[in-house]
A protein has these predicted regions:
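Conserved N-terminal beta1-alpha1 strand-loop-helix module at the mouth
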Residues: 1-95, 142, 147, 151-154
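Structural preference for beta-strand elements that scaffold enzyme active sites
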Residues: 15-17, 45-46, 66-70, 98-101, ...
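Conserved, mostly hydrophobic/aromatic
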Residues: 19, 57, 92, 133, ...
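Glycine-rich phosphate-binding active-site loops on the catalytic face of alpha/beta enzymes
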Residues: 21, 71-75, 79, 94-109, ...
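Glycine-rich, proline-tolerant flexible connector loops at the mouths of alpha/beta enzymes
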Residues: 36, 40-56, 75, 100-118, ...
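Alpha-helix-loop-beta-strand connector modules within alpha/beta enzyme cores
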Residues: 51, 55-75, 114-139, 169-196, ...
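Conserved anion-binding
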Residues: 78, 84-93, 99-159
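Catalytic cores of alpha/beta
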Residues: 79-91, 140-152, 175-190, 194-211
Length: 230
């Protein structure tokens, strides 16, 4: 999937890259509603949330077509049985999710059970929703990362996400490495520690096709202020 760089004259495109995160377990409904309203106001391309918040988020987003409702599956560590993981994905599909961000079974990857690793992803892909696999890419050895990417693409994943937000911040160097391994065959979602406009633009211009962040509103306001000063 080709990426589309943003230059200084195209900040208005920025919201189409933003997947606003609503993953804090302490988030109350008032705060969730405010996030949903911001997604509608700024035309963010996605709202990423937990299974428990899918239904209220779907209700608040209403008929808005620009913001896709994204559910995280087996988040944040993926360390649950595959059958339960698939049940989570099916439940998400039944309760309004339009896309899935899935944490895979890293034990299978490290122990060389690559067929089992891929089969889990394939079963979730078969549900029919576009899915990204959260690979925690900055922690994986390069050979395991390359192997995982091939398995994910072969299993039907439509994107790779850099991390779950608990590790290292996404950076330009790693996005470029992912881009070289993926070779335009699927999307790249950068996530983790993205708090500023400069970070977001650097990641997009390095090859990220979406930006997962809890700071979508701040980043977009920073972009709009930048345009006003031009």
């Amino acid at each position: 999937m080709p990426y589309k760089p943003i230059n200084d004259e195209k900040h208005n495109d920025l919201p189409s890259f933003i997947h606003q995160a609503a993953l804090d377990p302490h988030l109350n409904l008032d705060a969730l509603n405010q996030i949903c309203d911001a997604c509608i106001h700024f035309n963010f391309s996605g709202l990423c949330t937990t299974l428990n918040k899918l239904s209220p988020a779907k209700k608040r987003l209403g008929q808005n077509k620009k913001t896709k409702l994204i559910a995280v599956i087996a988040f944040p560590f993926g360390d649950i049985p595959s059958a339960i993981k698939k049940k989570e994905a099916e439940w998400a599909a039944e309760h309004g999710a339009e896309e899935l961000d899935v944490v895979p079974n890293f034990l299978n990857l490290y122990e060389g059970a690559i067929e089992d690793f891929a089969e889990e992803i394939s079963k979730i892909s078969s549900i029919g929703l576009p899915s990204r696999v959260i690979l925690d890419t900055m922690r994986l050895p390069k050979e395991k990362l390359a192997l995982a990417i091939e398995a994910c693409i072969d299993a039907g994943a439509q994107g790779i996400q850099t991390g779950n937000g608990f590790g290292f911040a996404a950076n330009q160097t790693h996005i470029r490495e992912l881009r070289s391994l993926i070779k335009n065959r699927c999307a790249i979602k950068a996530a983790g520690g993205i708090k500023s406009l400069m970070q977001a633009l650097e990641l997009i211009n390095s090859g990220a096709t979406s930006i997962g962040t809890s700071y979508g509103v701040d980043i977009t306001k920073e972009s709009k202020n930048h345009l006003k000063q031009k």
